[in-house]
A protein has these predicted regions:
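Generic detection of intrinsically disordered/low-complexity segments and helix-coil linkers/edges
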Residues: 9, 14, 28, 34, ...
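Conserved acidic, small-residue-rich alpha-beta core segments centered on
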Residues: 274-421, 426, 431
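Generic recognition of cysteine residues
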Residues: 8, 19-21, 61, 345, ...
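Bacterial Sec-dependent N-terminal signal peptides
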Residues: 1-24
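Flexible, low-complexity junctional segments that flank or bridge functional domains
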Residues: 21-263, 267-296, 370, 374-377, ...
Length: 434
């Protein structure tokens, strides 16, 4: 089994240990230079995806950011510059996080009030979670036509895109227009203009509040199960976090799964977790051993560098996962749902599922970001995460930086959002009952 630490695992560690208060302007010029230089150095030796950004001159970028970090007015602004610096690497598992106290004071999101997504070239409200917004008439399917009196696309490019970490264009789009679009300083509500279905525009002021996804992953429900059409089970896996609890939860659900005639597994909006959990679940659906992905990581051998050699790689061997021998294996048809919000360990789950040849994937291309981040402590109790590993299918095909293609592509339309339809699930039911 792969000894793999996914990004959300590291973030849970980060946010559980970095929680004390500190002076918000504590970093000296020496600290700021050191932090920037530490990132530059560790990335130079350990980052696994320079081959996917051949036009980036990392040394030149480092030089460009020296005056920028020195001119930062406080610790928060300094970390914003570091985030911009790291975003140049275009990798979803390579990023910078501030100390939690600063993040909670300065950074907030409206994700608990409403959710958004870019659909058919428009910024569409997909969920309305706040009662006061519902009372005022906001509904899923409506379009956001302005943010802080700006075109939403111009606003996103100026205030959101520079801080986004993404390995693929579709993951970048999701992070800009879904996960971070209305985020910003906690003390500053975001003003949006929303066009209803009759063309009328209503203005709203949306408050922001501190929110840490990783904390919610620990406290939220990782698994959901119900039976849909014609005794078809539907298993929603929200994350692969919480080793012992999620195993016991799955074991309880598995007794119900065994009673179904077919199964749909949904890993949409799954941000990842622990590989041993994802493979624990998959082993219940495997009646023979299956291979898991290969990986490689950059190596630095000083003598070889002195002889002028190019980058060298440590490459893993093949790994094979054996099915359970002491449990009843589920052998009935399975369909897997995935999309651009299927990230990290959830993508490895998809890759293993395809390798097992247990069924089709329905939905859209996955995020295209997985790997093993190195954690680097920074001045001011921040943390840099640097992806050190490239993952592949067992046959050598890449999916990091590309995403995993579905067998059947289905994407929700604006009309689907308005009607509260799930065309991906509907297509899966149709496929599995054929």
């Amino acid at each position: 089994m792969k000894g793999k630490i996914q990004i959300c695992t590291l973030l849970i560690i980060v946010f559980s240990v970095n929680c004390y208060c500190q002076n918000e302007n504590s970093l000296s010029s020496k600290d700021k230079i050191y932090g920037l230089s530490l990132i530059w150095k560790e990335v130079s030796y350990n980052f696994a995806f320079f081959n996917q950004i051949p036009d980036l001159n990392w040394d030149s970028c480092y030089q460009d950011f020296i005056p920028r970090v020195l001119e930062s007015e406080n610790d928060w602004d300094y970390y914003l510059e570091l985030q911009k610096f790291m975003s140049l690497l275009q990798d979803g598992h390579t990023r910078v996080f501030t100390q939690v106290h600063l993040r909670n004071k300065y950074y907030g999101t409206s994700i608990k009030q409403l959710n958004t997504k870019l659909i058919e070239g428009k910024v569409i409200i997909t969920r309305v979670l706040d009662d006061s917004l519902r009372i005022r008439g906001m509904k899923p399917g409506m379009e956001i036509v302005a943010i802080n009196e700006m075109n939403p696309f111009i606003y996103a490019e100026q205030y959101v895109a520079p801080y986004v970490y993404a390995s693929t264009p579709h993951d970048r789009q999701l992070q800009i227009f879904s996960q971070n679009l209305l985020s910003g300083r906690v003390a500053e509500p975001v003003r949006i203009e929303v066009k209803d279905f009759d063309g009328k525009v209503e203005r709203y002021s949306i408050y922001r509040e501190p929110w840490i996804m990783e904390e919610e992953m620990l406290t939220g429900k990782p698994l959901e199960f119900r039976v849909v059409a014609k005794n078809t089970g539907y298993l929603k896996i929200n994350n692969f976090v919480g080793s012992n609890s999620i195993r016991s939860d799955f074991d309880s659900i598995y007794e119900k799964i065994l009673l179904t005639d077919a199964l749909i597994i949904d890993v949409r909006e799954n941000m990842g977790g622990w590989t041993d959990i994802s493979q624990y679940i998959l082993k219940h659906f495997a009646n023979k051993p299956f291979k898991t992905g290969k990986w490689r990581s950059p190596e630095n051998i000083a003598a070889h560098r002195s002889w002028g050699s190019n980058i060298e790689w440590f490459e893993s061997g093949e790994y094979e996962v054996a099915p359970f021998t002491d449990k009843v294996i589920y052998t009935r048809p399975i369909v897997l749902l995935a999309d651009e919000s299927t990230f990290s360990c959830a993508e490895d789950f998809c890759a293993d599922f395809l390798t097992m040849k247990r069924g089709k994937i329905v939905g859209s291309k996955t995020a295209g970001s997985s790997g093993n981040p190195l954690m680097v402590k920074l001045p001011g109790e921040g943390v840099a995460l640097i992806c050190t590993k490239q993952d592949f299918f067992p046959d050598g095909r890449e999916y990091v930086g590309f995403g995993i293609d579905p067998d059947i592509e289905v994407k929700p339309s604006i009309e689907d959002i308005f009607q509260n339809n799930d065309p991906v699930l509907q297509a899966a039911i149709k496929t599995i009952l054929q």
